[in-house]
């Protein structure tokens, strides 16, 4: 496969971190569950539990209905949930992932100070590491998990290392 080829083609001076990343990918394997609903999920319970999210659920119903008419796996448009603290945005995302039967990954932006934490650092850097999104996809069971980037408005860091740049 492509990962094996990339590992074999690494130059002798390649970083140990990059080599370890490829090896980790090989150990994890290339197979992931890819969620594709056969029927429209029952959003009614979720809508009763979290009535503030009715408009979002309507959009999701439409996206999922369209997906069901194709051969493609479920891919939802990224969404920004706005609202006061405590209205249930994170809870909504967790419940949505459960309803869809896919993975859930949480990334708290208030504590991130560098852009590479989300997207990963370039292999040219000595201590390069993959980012949180990579970790969710390689270490998770699903190819299309729900990934929550929480408190995006609280992302810190100067413009040179802006964590939002990778989004």
Q: Where do the PLM segments sit?
A:
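Pre-Walker A (pre-P-loop) alpha-helix and adjacent loop at the N terminus of AAA/AAA+ ATPase modules
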Residues: 37-82
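Interdomain "pre-motor" coupling segment immediately N-terminal to P-loop NTPase/helicase cores
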Residues: 1-41
